[in-house]
Amino acid sequence: MDLLSALTLETWVLLAVILVLLYRLGTHRHGIFKKQGIPGPKPLPFLGTVLNYYKGLGRFDMECYKKYGKIWGLFDGQTPVFAIMDTEMIKNVLVKECFSVFTNRRDFGPVGIMGKAVSVAKDEEWKRYRALLSPTFTSGRLKEMFPIIEQYGDILVKYLKQEAETGKPVTMKKVFGAYSMDVITSTSFGVNVDSLNNPKDPFVEKTKKLLRFDFFDPLFLSVVLFPFLTPIYEMLNICMFPKDSIAFFQKFVHRIKETRLDSKHKHRVDFLQLMLNAHNNSKDEVSHKALSDVEIIAQSVIFIFAGYETTSSTLSFVLYFLATHPDIQKKLQEEIDGALPSKAPPTYDIVMEMEYLDMVLNETLRLYPIGNRLERVCKKDIELDGLFIPKGSVVTIPTYALHHDPQHWPKPEEFHPERFSKENKGSIDPYVYLPFGNGPRNCIGMRFALMNMKLALTKVLQNFSFQPCKETQIPLKLSRQAILEPEKPIVLKVLPRDAVINGA
C-alpha cells in the first residue's frame, strides 16, 4: 500500500501542527522590525537573511542602503541585526554608549582559548587586556620596533629586484603576504622568518593554516544560524581555530617564556616580551596581574590574525591604484625622494610625517576597508534616537557602504587622495570614515599597521615603479568573502625606478 494513503487523518493533522509550530518557531522574532516600521529584505524561517551574503557583504549592504535608506533590519538566523548608516547613531554606538550598552563584539562560534584575545573578550576582561596592551602601541614603542620592520623591508626590496630582472608580472598578495608574515612573526614573537624564501618553515605553515577562513564554512554558518550550538561545540572541544596551530603556539610561547625569565631579555621590543613585562597600574589585584600564558598566546595569535590580512591586502590595493594612476604614483615617489634623498634609509618620524603618503593610504582604505562591517552586541534594552534596540540584538555599521556613500564622498568610486589633504581632512565626519573603527574599542593595532604599511610603501617606491599588465584585472572586482579581497589576485609589472611609467 502507498505510504501516503496509509497515513490516518490524525497523523496528517499532527504533521500539519508540527509544521506550523516549526514555522512559528523559525519566524517568532521577525516582527521586531515590522513593529517599528524598519524596512529590510524578507527573512526566511530559521535562515533569516543570510543567504543574501553570497553576493558579498559590501555589495549587499550597498543594495540595502539604496533600497531602504539609513536604517534597515536583517536576521542572521534568528538574531536581529540593526544596520545603521546615520552618523549620530554610529557615534552613540561606538562612543557614547560603548561602556554601558555596546561594549562587546558578537560571538562567532567556539573559539577555545581565543576567547581571551583582546578583540574577542568582553566587558571587564576586555578592559583589563586593553589597559595592559595599550602601552605596547605607543609611538615610543613603535619607534623601537621600526628597525626590526625595516630589515624586512630590505628583504622585500631584494626579492622584488630579482622579480623585476625576470620581467615576469608579480602577484602582489604573494609578495606582501610574505612581508606581512615576516613582520608580524618577528614583532609578535621575536622569530626571524624569511617567508618568501622559506615557505615550508613550520612557523609559516602553522600561521597560514590559522588564517584560512570562509564565511560559508559549515561550522561557522551553523553557529550564525543557531547560536545555541556554541556551548555544545565547546563541550565537545570543537573550535573555529585549527587545534594543531594553537597547540604549536602554546608550546612556542611556553618555551620562549622560559628562556626570557632572566632580566637581560626585558629590554627586547617584540610584543611577546612586552606582554611578559606588562602590568596594569591599577591597585585592583584582578586587573593588576600580568597576562597569563594562555592570555599571551591569545593576544599573539590575534595580532597575526588581524595584522596579516590588513597589511598584505591593503598594500596590494595601494599598488594597484598607483599602477593604474601613474600621475599619483609619480607624485608620491617625488615626495619620498624629497624626504629621503638618494634612497636614504627611512626613519620613523620621516615616514609618519609624509603627507601625500598618508593621503594615498587613507584613500585606499576608504575604497577598500578590509572589514566590510563593524558590529556591536546590545547588552540591554535601549532606545537610541527613537529606535528601540532589544537586548541580544546586533548593531552593524556597514563600513564599505559608508565609505562609498555619495552623500559623503563625491564620485565615491574614483581614487582621489586629495580627499584627505590638510585642507579637506578637517571637513570629514569621523563617523563616515572607519577603516579601524572608532571609540574605546577601535583597532588597538591601528598605529602599528599604518607604520608598517607606510614603511613598506616607502622602501618599495624608493626602488620601483609599478605598471598594469595583461593579467591585471581592470576594473578590479571583489570576491564574495567576508573579508574584503579581490576576486582575482592583483598582478602587476615591477620596474626599476629608471623605467618609464606608462600606466593605464
Curated annotation (Swiss-Prot):
Q: Name one GO biological process term.
A: xenobiotic metabolic process
Q: Which cofactor does it need?
A: heme
Q: Name where it's found.
A: Endoplasmic reticulum membrane; Microsome membrane
* Domain of life the protein comes from: Eukaryota
The UniProt annotation places heme binding at 443
Enzyme class per UniProt: oxidoreductase
- Tissues in which the protein is found: Expressed in liver.
Induction details: By pregnenolone 16-alpha-carbonitrile (PNCN) and dexamethasone.
Main location (coarse class): endoplasmic reticulum
**Record keywords, A-Z:** Endoplasmic reticulum, Heme, Iron, Membrane, Metal-binding, Microsome, Monooxygenase, Oxidoreductase
Give an example GO molecular function: demethylase activity
Q: Which reaction does it catalyse?
A: an organic molecule + reduced [NADPH--hemoprotein reductase] + O2 = an alcohol + oxidized [NADPH--hemoprotein reductase] + H2O + H(+)
Which Pfam families would you find in this protein's record?
p450 (PF00067)
The UniProt entry's GO CC annotations, sorted and at most eight, read:
cytoplasm; endoplasmic reticulum membrane
Its placement in the membrane is given as: Peripheral membrane protein
Q: What is its EC number?
A: 1.14.14.1
What does the protein in this record do? Cytochromes P450 are a group of heme-thiolate monooxygenases. In liver microsomes, this enzyme is involved in an NADPH-dependent electron transport pathway. It oxidizes a variety of structurally unrelated compounds, including steroids, fatty acids, and xenobiotics.
The Swiss-Prot or TrEMBL record describes its family as follows:
Belongs to the cytochrome P450 family.
- Name this polypeptide is given: Cytochrome P450 3A2
Tell me what organism the protein belongs to.
Rattus norvegicus
Quick one: which gene encodes this?
Cyp3a2
